[in-house]
Amino acid sequence: MASLGSSAGGRRPTVLLQIALFVVVAAIIINSSVCLGATAVHDAAASGTGALDPNVPAVPTPGGAGQPYTGRGCRTVYGCRPPAGGQP
């Protein structure tokens, strides 16, 4: 250790300080993420809207409520054939 000189003694507190700073920042980020997620879930449950409401679909239907899904049409690029008598 004596061959490392005085610079090694100065690096150790710096590395420990960097590790401590990393731990503090990680704890703040993790804590705020959990709190924000819990707040969003609580707000959705309390208001009765959102993905937690069984009467409201989590994903909107493409054609609107009660409308059939028409898709993107039939093109030769997709290799499909329109049904007899009309458009798909």
From Swiss-Prot:
It comes from the Eukaryota. The chain crosses the membrane at residues 14-35. It is a single-pass type II membrane protein. It is found in: Membrane. Signal peptide: none annotated. Its main location: membrane. The keyword Signal does not apply. Residues 1-13 are cytoplasmic. GO terms for cellular component: membrane. Keywords: Membrane, Transmembrane, Transmembrane helix. Coiled coil: none annotated. Residues 36-88 are extracellular. Associated with pathogen defense. This is Protein WIR1A. It comes from Triticum aestivum.
